[in-house]
Amino acid sequence: MAKDLKKPKDEAKSKKWVATLMIVFASIGLLASFVLSVDAFTLLKDSDTQLACNLNAALNCVEVMKTPQSEILFGIPNSFFGMMAFPVLITIGVMIAIGARLPKWFKTCMQLGVLGGLAFAWWMFFDSLYVIGVLCPWCLTVTTGMTIIFGAVTHYNLRENTFDFKRPTYDKILKFLNADGDKLIWATVLVIFAFLAFAKFGIALFE
C-alpha cells in the first residue's frame, strides 16, 4: 500500500518543495545572521549606536543584543553560529534538489541538527518575549525560517521513512503528508507565535 501512496510524481514534487524551502529560508537565515554579526561589531565600537532594526519599543535588536542570551557560548554572538549552520542547510537543499541519494545516517544527523536549531530559535523567541521583554526583528526572521526548515526536513525524512516505521504506521504517515497535515501544523505554530507577540505588545508592535 505504501508504494501506491508514494507516487513518483508526488515524490519529485515533494523533494522540489523541500529543497526550495531549505534553500530560500536558509539563505534568509544566513542574511539575518550576517546582518546581526555586523551589528554586533558595530555595538562593540559604540554601545549607544542606533541600528536600522531598532523599529520601536517592542522591536529592538540592540536591547536584545546587549543581553547575555545573545552570546550563550563562550561569549560568541549567536549569529556567528548561524553563519556557519545556514550554508550547510543551503548545500543540503541543493543536494536534494539535484536528486542526490542521502544515506540514512546523514538524514538522521540532518534531522537532529535542525531540531537543535529549532530548539534554540524557539528558546530565544520565548526568552525575548517573556524575559528580555523586547523582540529582535532579525531574530524573528531566523525563528520563522528555522520553523519552516524543520518542517520541511521532517516532511522529507518522514516520506523517506528514515526512522524505519512499520508498514501500517508508514501508510498512515504518508496519508497525513499527502493531505498536507504537517503544513497545517507548522502554519498554525507560526500563527500562534504571532498571536503571542501581539498579546504581549499589542499595538506597540506597529508604532
Predicted regions: what is each one?
Residues K16-L44, F193-F198:
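N-terminal signal-anchor transmembrane alpha helix
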Residues S70-V88, L135-T147:
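Membrane-interface loop-to-helix entry segments
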Residues I76-I98, G116, F120:
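Hydrophobic alpha-helical transmembrane segments
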Residues N178-A204:
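Final/C-terminal transmembrane alpha-helix of multipass membrane proteins
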